[in-house]
């Protein structure tokens, strides 16, 4: 007989921080990830953490910028929590050994990014912030005696008994599947980028968390709001698309068309530093009418400030000091997700969520640059503390976990269904992308239903992705307005409502 422990699904910044917080509260924890610990979108983050630490800045100013970027949909209280608790989380990261970039005076170097009114972005290793932070937290998690790590172990479904989630059915890389009983399950599975043909997300970002939550009746919110990063390196057929960080534009790079015209200025007076949804649409228009390029030739210290991007560009025979960089938008981030309260509880008892998979209300219709890692830290911390408190207040009898014959096995049907997924990605990009309409969304719904009908029943991974694609499409069709990351050609921007689809 074993006492059930909290199970955390995912090892991005939200998953690792939740595990560390629970363990620091004395709570033994299990962390499950379908690949290795380092395989997450967090580890790929080139941008930094937005936090109000500089002179003339404040959490209230950071909150104002966040609310302005959200296009009227962010929850002011969630945003207040995000920006006011952020500095404490950064200081905790420093105490754990994280090393952020500093200036000659020894102070944290603060960068400027789109739609921020103050320089407040801290970086680690120039453009390798995510890798540096995940490396630090991974070491903490691997060494902690209260944290058990199950790598290369896939969560097939949530175990839902009675009125609550009580565990996860898992499928290891080798061996039989089994049920892992849990005192609570925390989803920290990241985003949905692999539902699209062009994305900056790693291949593990297959919308698992949304599908798992939906299957047990947890509410999803604002899933129609998807952010397309304006400056992915344009390399047709490459998945994932290499990212050229927002920080490059913050350092002075310009967006130009084939004539050298700064087209972003025609969309918004802030030009390259306008909110991402505006810049992405401007880049898409330029790309469709001759091409869009990022001109970083004026950044003399580019290789020193952006070593990772410099190396990536060199692999594609581009030198940012001499060449224009061809760019195009790519699916980057999901603003909505599993609806949670401000402590990470979903609408289904026993199920929690943190990070990109969750909808806390901090992003609204459009995320402010570099608020994603911050959200992962702040709300994972709140979830860990609240869950530890809840577990101390309750007493549950030991239960046993073991093999369960109903767990899906890997029959190879998903591999055989790859052509279906490829068609789904192209369909979503063409019809549920930066520009949508009633006609495109209806077409996508019909085609996704057809693809689901053509998919073998035992291809459960494929069915989960098709399910989430249909949910996103339906939510987008029901939201009859244009706002933030959701733009409909048949509903031009006008008076905005607060209701969500």
Predicted regions and their residues:
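Short hydrophobic core segments
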Residues: 7-9, 180-189
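N-terminal Rossmann-fold NAD(P) dinucleotide-binding loop
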Residues: 15
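Conserved redox-cofactor binding core of oxidoreductases
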Residues: 95-177, 188, 232-235
């Amino acid at each position: 007989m074993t006492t059930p422990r909290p199970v955390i699904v995912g090892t991005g910044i939200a998953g690792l921080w939740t595990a560390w917080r629970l363990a620091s509260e004395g709570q033994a924890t299990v962390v499950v990830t379908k690949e290795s610990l380092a395989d997450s979108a967090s580890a790929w983050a080139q941008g930094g953490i937005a936090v109000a630490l500089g002179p003339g800045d404040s959490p209230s100013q950071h909150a104002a910028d966040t609310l302005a970027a959200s296009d009227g949909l962010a929850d002011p209280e969630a945003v207040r929590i995000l920006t006011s608790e952020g500095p404490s989380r950064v200081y905790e990261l420093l105490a754990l050994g994280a090393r952020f970039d500093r200036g000659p005076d020894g102070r944290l170097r603060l960068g400027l990014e789109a739609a921020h009114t103050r320089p407040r972005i801290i970086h680690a290793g120039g453009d390798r912030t995510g890798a540096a932070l995940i490396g630090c937290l991974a070491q903490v998690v691997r060494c902690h005696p209260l944290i058990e790590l199950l790598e290369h172990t896939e969560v097939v479904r949530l175990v839902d008994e009675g009125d609550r989630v009580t565990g996860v059915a898992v499928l290891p890389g080798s061996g039989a599947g089994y049920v892992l009983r849990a005192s609570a399950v925390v989803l920290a599975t990241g985003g949905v980028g692999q539902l699209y043909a062009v994305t900056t997300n790693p291949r593990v970002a297959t919308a698992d968390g949304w599908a798992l939550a939906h299957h047990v009746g947890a509410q999803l919110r604002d899933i129609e709001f998807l952010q397309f990063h304006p400056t992915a390196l344009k390399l047709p057929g490459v998945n994932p698309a290499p990212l050229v960080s927002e920080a490059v534009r913050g350092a002075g790079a310009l967006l130009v068309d084939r004539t050298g015209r700064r087209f972003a200025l025609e969309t918004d007076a802030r030009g390259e530093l306008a909110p991402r949804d505006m810049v992405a649409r401007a880049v898409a228009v330029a790309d469709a009418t001759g091409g869009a390029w990022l001109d970083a030739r004026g950044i003399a210290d580019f290789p020193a400030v952006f070593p990772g991007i410099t190396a990536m560009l060199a692999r594609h025979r581009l030198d940012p000091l001499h060449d224009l960089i061809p760019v195009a938008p790519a699916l980057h981030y999901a603003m909505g997700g599993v609806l949670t309260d401000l402590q990470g509880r979903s609408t289904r008892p026993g199920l929690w969520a943190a990070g990109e998979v969750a909808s806390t209300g901090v992003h609204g219709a459009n995320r402010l640059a570099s608020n994603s890692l911050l959200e992962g830290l702040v709300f994972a911390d709140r979830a860990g503390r609240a869950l530890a408190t809840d577990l101390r207040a309750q007493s549950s009898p030991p239960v046993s976990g073991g093999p369960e014959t109903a767990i899906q096995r890997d029959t190879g049907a998903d591999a055989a269904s790859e052509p279906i997924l490829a068609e789904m990605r192209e369909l979503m990009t063409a019809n549920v992308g930066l520009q949508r309409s009633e006609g495109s969304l209806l077409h996508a719904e019909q085609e996704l239903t057809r693809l689901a009908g053509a998919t073998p029943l035992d291809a459960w991974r494929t069915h989960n992705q098709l399910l989430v694609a249909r949910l996103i499409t339906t939510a987008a069709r029901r939201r009859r307005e244009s706002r933030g990351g959701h733009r409909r050609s048949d509903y031009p921007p006008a008076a905005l409502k607060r209701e969500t689809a």
